[in-house]
């Protein structure tokens, strides 16, 4: 085992087998933070979870403040930080991962492979000096949508499936082409989402917090109300109907739609326009004295932090710290991806790999994985 795998963990995908997933990620937060002052959590965790460091830092700050009795509505700046990181992560995954996981078959002769690279480099949102929202919306229109962002998003809200089909078949940007190439297979991968929404209810949050506090291995194998749920950009608390995303095609589309929405909201804030509420929710709940649970909706789904502070002569220090990240729900051995993997018919290794690529693009495990076929195929693939 390499040092990197020891830190991040590794998943094994087992198509056509039960369970469809094996392996887990190490729970490092408590080992890193135990005995440190509470204020250490929002400073150290972003270094441990670099890809989504902002989300972990924001959520840790909310949890520690609530445990110290400082419960208040999150400041607007926290929502802006979370939204910016989420949009950037969507862009990176679409440009860096989708070429590996979604593209298949012949590439059109008119396609220049250097164009996506230039577009990623030119993306205003990814620049350290990003401040011009109009430039980001213009980039979205040119590099992603092929039409005005507001027009595309209005079509999406009216008819998600129709919007994606029209866009993927008529527009020649790199993301549209990638979606076009996986369209038939992704649409056939039907699965009604079971959305993880405990942050809709204080009672549900308390129930989850009780499990987190009482079961050391709960973050590795979380469940709620006896079930394993899924989380992603298609299960946001602010969405009217999560059941509209009934296949992998629409779940992939939800990431595009959220990128567009976050970019438009960024533009509205820059111009002083009002809007009803943040796209992404966050909050904290004080529990027993010195304990709190905080949550945030980040790029891969719902992130939860639980903290327990203990008093010492030098002041409160961390006595317990547990995190449930979206990966633990989505790639649970009894979760959504595992069920899809178990039902894949492993007769053609190439077809199975393509289906796995679509699942990985939609749910994004954020850790290395291995594909382990049944003995009849005699093949193991590393990714």
From Swiss-Prot:
Statement: the UniProt record of this protein carries the keyword Ribosomal protein: no
Entry keyword ATP-binding: no
Entry keyword set: Plasmid
InterPro entries: NiFe-Hase_large, NiFe/NiFeSe_hydrgnase_LSU
Taxonomy, superkingdom: Bacteria
Protein name per Swiss-Prot or TrEMBL: Hydrogenase expression/formation protein HoxV
Organism: Cupriavidus necator (strain ATCC 17699 / DSM 428 / KCTC 22496 / NCIMB 10442 / H16 / Stanier 337)
Protein's gene: hoxV
